[in-house]
């Protein structure tokens, strides 16, 4: 009993880790858990490096879950799609003609199986034809701006309507040798505006697009307008020697009335290059929306060098186009006044009037009468800072949101104002000569105009002069701003 009382009690074993060491170990374990969670649940796996030996082998991937779905049933969210499959495909059922008409609540049923040109048409059934009053206002404002622009450029040596028409009609490649220099004596761009009405939507069978394409038909009428052109020239008799005899000729052409049905349709952009249009032998190639293509159609002028295709920058992506034409049942009434001779004069020769009318009708039908159409590229409507501006008189409301102007831009760089010119007749739109007294033309006899083809002379009232002397056949309002004129706020780079 005495030995058991004096025996010492056993001590409890002390921990080998201190409090600080345990705290640090706990923090480290928490950091490791957080890092593992971020790595396996948030971050993705790096793509394996390309290997020639492993290219033909099947790679096995680990799945974090117990259930591994089959590859054919669904795609894993962690798989990155290819660059060609980022944009979701649009089903063809939502882009065809029937789907568009159904979603816009515009139904069309076939009423005429075939048309004059062998195409199947579908006429509207549930909608009454629109009056297009709002469209007439927009077109009238556009034409009025073109007329003001033509007057503002009347003193320009290169961009005026007078210089453009004179250079186009005196083109040595088109004008015959027995015609002397042609001088424009009178130009009138008119005072009235075309009236569009009776708009209807039809569906036309098109083998290129699925379900056909939609086409808008608009009735247009222009009458009692003051649109005309008058020229003076001489017919040369070069036998037995050059300029053996000269016969003065004065000619005035005006349009009494024009009416017809305008067809407008959209042509979607295609990644494939379009096939070149068939043009008659000896005629220039039709212009495209790319100015580099138009420049390549003309011969190099003096001081120019021909650049290879490798030096040109890559072309932009294909754009959608709008095609317009007139149905063959159009009406174009012309008034032709002529005066031939110096001492003994012949006035208003019927044969000359018939020749001029035939050439004008042929010129018009070769370009914009079905089945021929004019194709115009649609502009880029994506908002850009280079084209951003502020309406006049609202600078204070814009405040700091207006884009900054460069130091070189001034107030004079804005659009020209014509407030002082409304009270008087635009002299640039009418060039008077001695033709009025010789032909007896009054103010009411001047209406629409086309330039005259005589022999190989080509009509040019609706053509545009290129920078190198060649002409393109697409329409452009005479006196408009040059194609190279930048549009937008000066001094601001395009983003």
From Swiss-Prot:
Q: How does it sit in the membrane?
A: Single-pass type I membrane protein
Q: What is this protein called?
A: Maintenance of mitochondrial morphology protein 1
Write down a Pfam family by its short name: MMM1
Q: Which CDD domains match?
A: SMP_Mmm1
Specify the SMP-LTD domain's residue ranges. 128-379
State the UniProt keywords alphabetically.
Endoplasmic reticulum, Lipid transport, Lipid-binding, Membrane, Transmembrane, Transmembrane helix, Transport
| One MF term in the entry's GO annotations | lipid binding
Question: Partners and quaternary state?
Answer: Homodimer. Component of the ER-mitochondria encounter structure (ERMES) or MDM complex, composed of mmm1, mdm10, mdm12 and mdm34. A MMM1 homodimer associates with one molecule of mdm12 on each side in a pairwise head-to-tail manner, and the SMP-LTD domains of mmm1 and mdm12 generate a continuous hydrophobic tunnel for phospholipid trafficking.
- What are the subcellular locations of this protein? Endoplasmic reticulum membrane
Name the domain of life this protein comes from. Answer: Eukaryota
GO cellular component terms listed in the entry, alphabetical order: endoplasmic reticulum membrane; ERMES complex
Indicate yes or no for the key word Transmembrane.
yes
Q: Does the keyword Transferase apply?
A: no
Bridged cysteine pairs (disulfide): none
Give the lineage.
Eukaryota, Fungi, Dikarya, Ascomycota, Pezizomycotina
Which gene carries the instructions for this protein? mmm1
**Similarity comment:** Belongs to the MMM1 family.
Q: Which PANTHER family match?
A: SMP-LTD DOMAIN-CONTAINING PROTEIN, TEX2 PROTEIN-RELATED
The stretches that face the Lumenal side, renumbered to this chain, are 1-22
